[in-house]
Amino acid sequence: MSRYRGPRLKKIRRLGALPGLTRKTPKSGSNLKKKFNSGKKEQYRIRLQEKQKLRFHYGLTERQLLRYVHIAGKAKRSTGQVLLQLLEMRLDNILFRLGMASTIPGARQLVNHRHILVNGRIVNIPSFRCKPRDIITTKDNQRSKGLVQNYIASSDPGKLPKHLAIDTLEYKGLVNKILDRKWVGLKINELLVVEYYSRQT
């Protein structure tokens, strides 16, 4: 299944706020409040909805998300929490959380177009996994810095998660540590996502 490129408002009406996909938020009284049949179909719908929220927020294909679930399942810690950590430490998401892009798709474009460096080296892979003490910067030219300047200036420092830091004058971000669960940028029940995939096998 390919990455979603359709109407974003349609998705947030169905799934709720997806800050990684769009800054828009669903209006009250949207499709989220529709009534559904109880029982197994309702439980399946809830698990599917949580899985879709995760996929569209981080801009993943179904195959990519499934691969992350498999990796997380091999860890000795909670599969759900490891899954969220893997997704949150992606370079495109780190740029988004630093405020260097307004959405994850926007951050992905910065990476694809070779505007971003990690520890002084160009990285053009959005799924690149960042780690503690990584330094994220733009290329040292006017065009690259101009692409993130407005986003950094308009970002709210109070919303910066504790595992990240940013120097707004140098356009430089720092990964301090692996994030804690409470700093995940999406309202999600990751256990339902893991349960969804466990029932598919």
Swiss-Prot record:
Function: One of the primary rRNA binding proteins, it binds directly to 16S rRNA where it nucleates assembly of the body of the 30S subunit.
PANTHER family the UniProt entry points to: 30S 40S RIBOSOMAL PROTEIN (PTHR11831), SMALL RIBOSOMAL SUBUNIT PROTEIN US4M (PTHR11831:SF4)
GO molecular function per UniProt: rRNA binding; structural constituent of ribosome
InterPro entries in alphabetical order: Ribosomal_uS4, Ribosomal_uS4_bac-type, Ribosomal_uS4_CS, Ribosomal_uS4_N, S4_RNA-bd, S4_RNA-bd_sf
Complex and partners: Part of the 30S ribosomal subunit. Contacts protein S5. The interaction surface between S4 and S5 is involved in control of translational fidelity.
Keyword Lipid biosynthesis attributed: no
GO cellular component terms listed in the entry, alphabetical order: chloroplast; small ribosomal subunit
Family: Belongs to the universal ribosomal protein uS4 family.
Name by which UniProt lists this protein: Small ribosomal subunit protein uS4c
GO biological process: ribosomal small subunit biogenesis; translation
Domain S4 RNA-binding positions: 89-157
Source species of the chain: Triticum aestivum (Wheat)
CDD domains linked to this entry: S4 (cd00165)
NCBIfam families assigned: PRK05327.1, rpsD_bact
Name of the gene encoding the protein in the UniProt record: rps4
Cell location: Plastid, Chloroplast
Keyword annotations from UniProtKB, A to Z: Chloroplast, Plastid, Ribonucleoprotein, Ribosomal protein, RNA-binding, rRNA-binding
Primary residence: plastid
Chain segments annotated as coiled-coil in the UniProt record: none
Presence of the UniProt keyword Ribosomal protein in the record: yes
